[in-house]
Amino acid sequence: MAITLREQYLEGFVSSHEMDCMAPQVAAAVRQLRQHTGAGSDFHGWLTLPRDYDKEELARIHAAAEKIREDTDVLVVIGIGGSYLGARSAIELLRSPYYNALGKDGPAIYFAGCNLSGSYLDEILALCEGKRVSLNVISKSGTTTEPALAFRVLRGMMERRYGKEAAGRIYCTTDRARGTLKSLADREGWQTFVIPDDVGGRYSVLTAVGLLPMAVAGIDIDAVLAGAEKAMTELDNDDFSHNPCYRYAAIRNILLRRGKAIEIYASYEPRFTQMGEWLKQLYGESEGKDGKGLFPASVAFTTDLHSMGQFIQDGSRNLFETVIDFITPAADLTVEEDPENLDGLNFLSGMAMRQINRRAMQGTILAHTRGGVPNLVLEVPAINEEEYGYMVYFFMLACGISGYLLGVNPFDQPGVEAYKKNMFALLGKPGYEDLRQELLAKLGE
């Protein structure tokens, strides 16, 4: 169990001298994390979470998940950003993108509160019709607009359907002691789980935020935490030349300084697609501030080779690719021979799909690097709970280091307030009257 960083496709883009120069800078960034001297140090709790996770809380998560699996046909997870992306990515990677159709050993799991679309929420309600439903609402404050609105609608549905018994089907993942959702849960008798004070949303996948939905999906969350703890131990290694996480953070920084402002996360495994969304939030929200940062994007190959492949090969040379390579797929098929061979593919007969997929990956990496796009490859041995936990910790650690290398606070997100103020003003929220008039004038209303 480990992630291997392949650097051979960086030749001509990143020099050994540059890497040597980055070593002391990375060491300084790591000290800011480990010694809690960097900006945002009050949100460093995720660093030791895999080892120090509250065992009583973990037991309650297991018990609640088992109850939900026994008495529920549909679990609706209500949250946005880090409050849902981690769980969704884990379920799709470790179970299947088709989990709700194939997961016959547990309830279907749908995600709400991640947008403001009325039609989306109406369809969630339709999926709940005639089914035994439970809710898992995730919010530290309980007042974030999207999940709060979705919870208002879904809570109403639950109370009309179950009456007082609805309380036994609502699970809240929220602050330990304060906030609107915590107060409401205490009043109504809903079971609660804790989002630690020192863990921010996008770093919270290894808390109840991610672990409860994962456990309901039948994922071994003890193995997830064990994999993350192994990463925590192995990556606490000051030998820069042999630490793939530190080297990954350094390479990203070098490429940014060379004008490669876009990082594309690429995988040849469709199960990884939602993980790409999680990475986009993790890195985009952590690094994108003070006029700095790499812009994170994601592609699903080979699908996107038939759309974005043209741009990556021949477009602006301001990007690089980070390829996540799963050595052993979750399942595989072998190509059969066709006597007619009308498609001309009999030369592939007897080959496993993973072999074909790997050759496609290798050919693409060679083509893109020749076209001026640096590629770094992160090899993950297999798709299982331990490797997932290891991978999640790897990326979070690299993100914290990368933020400090940039000179930004990787644990805040001040930029998200601008659109919220405008939205609240336009919706007529009390206290925003002057801004509302200003914005309506700009909109010509």
List each language-model region with its residue ranges.
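Glycine-rich phosphate/diphosphate-binding loops that line cofactor/substrate pockets in enzymes
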Residues: 60-73, 124-133, 251-261, 312-317
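Helicase-primase coupling helices
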Residues: 297-383
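Extended, charge-enriched "interface" segments that sit outside catalytic cores
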Residues: 1-69, 337-343, 347, 435-445
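Short glycine-rich or small-residue beta-strand-to-loop segments that form or flank ligand, phosphate
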Residues: 48-50, 74-81, 134-141, 261-269, ...
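Glycine-rich phosphate-binding loops that contact phosphosugars or nucleotide phosphates
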Residues: 66-238
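Active-site phosphate/pyrophosphate-binding segments
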Residues: 161-321, 327, 413-445
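C-terminal helical cap and adjacent loop that interface with cofactors, partners, or active-site loops
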Residues: 364-427
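Short, solvent-exposed amphipathic alpha-helical segments in soluble enzyme
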Residues: 92-95, 126-128, 152-154, 186-188, ...
